[in-house]
Amino acid sequence: MKRRLRAVAVAAAAMLLAVSLGACSSSTSPPGPSGSGTGATISTLTAGETAGYANLDPDQTQSCNDNFCGLFMEHLLQLGPNNTLEPELATSVSEPDSTTYIYHLRHGVKFWDGHEMTSADVVYSLDYQRSPKSDITVYFTNVKTITADGPYTVVVKLKQPDAGWKYTPSYEGVIFEKSFAEAHQGTMGNPGVLIQATGPWQLTSYDSTRSMELTANPHWWGGKVPIQHITVKYFSTETSMALAMRSGEIDLAFPSNGKTFEAAAGTGATLSSWSPPSIYFVSMNVKAAPFDDVHVRRAVAYALNRTDLIAANGGALTATPQSTLIPPSQLQTLGTQTEVNAVLNGLPQYPFDLAKAKQELAQSKYPHGFTAKTEIDNFGNDVEVIQAIAAELQKIGINVQISQVSSAQWSKDFTNGNLGGIAYTAFYAASPDPSIFPSYLLGNASTYNMSRYAPSSINTLMESGLADSAPAQRLADYGQLLKNVATDLPYVVLFAGHNYTELSTKYTLPPFSVYPAFSSWALHLKEKAS
């Protein structure tokens, strides 16, 4: 899992969103590509992963944000191809006004213990994950109330109109059993306790240092589950995981370094890539010297050569150049290609130019350069990229001292804002809405504002970008926001990355259109026809 943090016009009165499979059917499996293959039941699938959460409490795992969580945890909705919302535990959604969403639940859904899921479970689950102690509470800040209206209806009322909210139940707010959670307060999700959910596979054991075991859920609302048993083995490094793939010990993996993994995994597996919206970037703390000087930040922007940094990341197969905090593909949900290009062409640009970088530094309070510290962990090619960044900044007199730490330490320091005045990382977005990356990185309400950049103008633009219903006005809001960010440069976006799947040649699996964490992707895995 890369540092993947998740984060539509307001409907007319009583509009029904197109998220039903036809009436309120409760027996049809989730939509999605079927792929090619035999269609025969698979006895056991063995997958690999390099890190597991200490436990599976949704409050401590970004709502179970893991490549395999979608196999056993479900949401109200799911995001399908072309960013279409599709049913999962809710069959449809109605909007009687701009701040009210009514979710009509699927009837007959059972938890693994056989108890029926009702609105009480959904309300409890969502309230649990929007509590102040939750690590995803930021995604529910605009929620006023969540209430039940009968056993199969849940009403969410927002504090104000929010154009991005409609996607939220497809990537946040996994649903679990209320009675189980209440009986295991403080221990739910721990190994030996686990959780009660509704997904097609039942979680039967979990040890974050060894493995996760899943078995087919006989109660699943979607019908017969095609794989009887799934084992996820945890490895200390991607190298050891690749060697396990080569030997046939595992059948599937989601490597962070696809190019290197493919070479080590051998010819018995095939690598595929998929590219959800992402930004790989340098952040600078605008509230602390020396990065509180805008000329320093502009010097950094001019000094970084995206071609070199993509090469350090593994080359063109791993990334494509990008320079804006909101990817163009997300802006295109609000306007035509011509309209989006007009917005992007109007932004301040910082192409690689050492002469301009030196000129900007000369105008700063640090004309002779300075030393800054940063941290990095050994994830993917992050070490190689931060070393390349340091080498390029050294050319203009900025000495970046790099401390390599464990992933656990990096995550702790990231959460506490202790990575240093300058840092490199990447965020992936689960929502196609252009509000998602600003909500991660900008303004007073952001949990992940590494730069501490929160001028009142940005807060206002973020609020209006969500409150405005007309796509053209939202595009104007986000265009102005991008212009402000490009002028002040709290972040320098370098490129967009790719995600990878390595799959044994024994199997077929359709391309991913959304994150594995938010879909029951293994439903579509099949044995390859001979």
Q: Language-model features: where?
A:
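Detector for C-terminal structural segments
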Residues: 16, 21, 36-37, 207, ...
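N-terminal lobe/hinge region of extracytoplasmic solute-binding protein
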Residues: 48-97, 127, 196
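Surface-exposed binding/hinge segments that line
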Residues: 94, 102, 138-182, 205
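Gly/Pro-rich hinge or "lid" segments in bacterial periplasmic/extracellular proteins
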Residues: 170-224, 229
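Ligand/substrate-recognition segments at binding pockets and active sites
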Residues: 208, 354, 358-429, 445
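Ligand-site clamp/hinge motif
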Residues: 217-263
